[in-house]
Amino acid sequence: MRDPAPAYDGEGRHALWHVSENATIERFDPHVSTTAASSEPRVWAVDTRHLPFYWFPRECPRCMFWAAPNTTSEDADLLAGATRVHAVEDCWLERIRSARVVAYRLPEKCFAPDPEVGGYWLSRESVEPLELVELGDLLGLHAAAAIELRIVSNLWPLWDRVVASTLEFSGIRLHNAESRRDR
């Protein structure tokens, strides 16, 4: 299991969240994700520490990375002094600016930690949210949290460097990234 992402400025108390562009969800029912390794129906949640992974429109491809205890100083240079970096392609910038993204706070008693991925939680039962939070300015959230939002023309060169390094990382919706370019 990967090391958890580092704390961010203004990180609130531990809670579990489901992030969506749909602000009308009244109940989350277990389902089988098309990207999950398991065929068991589940409800997914993310903890507060990893909530910034979802400060994006759902389909936005993104690469997140941070140092781990075993990260070499050479690999840490990819962070360029940041504690945590979230990278997106420039073609998504306007969609990030205009997206309306909400976070549903979920009851922790229904969830258990995902044994495969740190920061993620699973429930086998239907879950009703406790609270709906409008995330607002997604770019501003990154700035306030001191998370570097790195804008690149194509994610693949950076992604390839990160996954070949000793950094910890997460990639979401990478299938939506621009095509790889010839090297």
State the predicted function of each range.
Residues 1-40, 55-57:
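ADP-ribose/NAD+-binding catalytic cleft of ART/PARP-like enzymes
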